[in-house]
């Protein structure tokens, strides 16, 4: 097969008329759009949003999946930044209804924006014995996208320090990562540390070593009755920023109680009801949907999730892709621990059921 020759159909995970997931053997291959490339998928990684979106916003025929790695096979005429044959990874956001009916990562082929793709480093580029494989790279798309918006978007935490321009201080500013052992949490901790901040985190005691290995200066048991007080004591009452990777009633309460008296900023990765966010007027909350960095309208049919097109967030992402790519090339980011799912796309369907049941600290990855 040449880079421009494709089969007439593909295998892909889709929803049936009842909203159930199945592997379709004759699914359409997404057409190439301006500014996009088509990738032959090698591996995919599972996220909670993969099963939540198909459960809460079912569409018969919808494709599923966000995180992927693979090889570029087709490039739109207006794209000159990448060539067929390049090994890449990223996030194929399918939150809008029209996009969900045409494209998803849990398939043999996936369509993605060229300006938001990351490249697998070559052996010549790798430093510090970097060994980012296609398998490991599949875990990074959503985590990196979410961290990009959560940490640096002006309406989120709005931090000024970045890995290439860290904040220099004898006493680094603390930032709480609630759920530090999640796939987003472990990446956020590393980016915060590299940006000159003092990342602290909550998680289960069984994950303390993992979270510390990623750069957290202190870790707290999320289930402790006085966890907020412990965080407040540790930070000397000067915690201004909290990234909540769990985003439930308990996590909101802990983050809000730990944030300093003058207030601060709180970012959730799930919708939080207004009555919970109104606990403290001095805290500025924001619900981050990483799909916003595509710069396109998000239409799911529910006000809490629907978003207008936001070119500023797309530009923020594009401006920072190079920085993150250089970090990847230098081996400066450790991927989340993985667990391989056997069975290809059929294994993905089973894996989503298992993920919904909880108890999976490792990132579930399948080779397509």
UniProtKB/Swiss-Prot annotation:
Presence of keyword Nucleotide-binding: yes
Binding site for substrate: 135-142, 290-294
Signal peptide stretch: none
UniProt binding sites for NADP(+): 49-52, 204-207, 222, 269-270, 360-361
Transmembrane segments: none
Family per similarity comment: Belongs to the zinc-containing alcohol dehydrogenase family.
Subunit comment: Monomer.
Entry protein name: Trans-enoyl reductase TwmE
């Amino acid at each position: 097969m040449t880079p421009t020759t494709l089969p007439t159909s593909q295998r892909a995970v889709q929803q049936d008329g009842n909203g159930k997931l199945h592997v379709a053997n004759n699914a359409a291959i997404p057409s190439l759009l301006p500014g996009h490339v088509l990738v032959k998928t090698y591996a995919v990684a599972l996220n909670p949003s993969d099963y939540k979106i198909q459960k809460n916003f079912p569409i018969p025929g919808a494709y599923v999946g966000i995180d992927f790695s693979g090889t570029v096979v087709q490039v739109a005429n207006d794209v000159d930044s990448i060539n067929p044959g390049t090994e890449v990874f990223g996030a194929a956001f399918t939150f809008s209804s029209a996009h969900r009916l045409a494209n998803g990562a849990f398939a043999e082929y996936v369509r993605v924006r060229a300006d938001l793709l990351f490249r697998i480093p070559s052996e010549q580029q790798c430093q510090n014995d970097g060994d980012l494989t296609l398998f490991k790279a599949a875990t990074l798309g959503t985590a990196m996208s979410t961290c990009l918006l959560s940490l640096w978007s002006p309406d989120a935490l709005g931090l000024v320090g970045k890995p290439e321009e860290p904040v220099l201080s004898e006493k680094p500013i603390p930032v709480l990562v609630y759920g530090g052992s999640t796939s987003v949490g472990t990446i956020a901790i590393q980016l915060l540390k590299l940006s000159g901040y003092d990342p602290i985190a909550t998680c289960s005691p069984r994950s303390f070593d993992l979270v510390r290995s990623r750069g957290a200066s202190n870790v707290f048991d999320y289930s402790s009755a006085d966890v907020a007080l412990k965080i407040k004591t540790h930070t000397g009452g000067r915690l201004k920023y909290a990234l909540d990777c769990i985003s439930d009633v308990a996590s909101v309460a802990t983050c809000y109680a730990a944030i300093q008296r003058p207030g601060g900023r709180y970012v959730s990765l799930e919708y939080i009801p207004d009555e919970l966010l109104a606990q403290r007027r001095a805290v500025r909350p924001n619900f981050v949907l990483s799909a916003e960095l595509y710069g396109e309208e998000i239409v799911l049919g529910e006000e809490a999730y629907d978003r207008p097109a936001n070119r500023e967030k797309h530009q923020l992402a594009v401006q920072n892709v190079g920085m993150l790519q250089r970090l990847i090339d230098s081996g400066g980011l450790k991927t989340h621990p993985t667990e391989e799912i056997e069975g290809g796309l059929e294994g993905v369907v089973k894996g989503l059921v298992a993920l919904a049941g909880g108890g999976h600290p490792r990132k579930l990855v399948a080779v397509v």
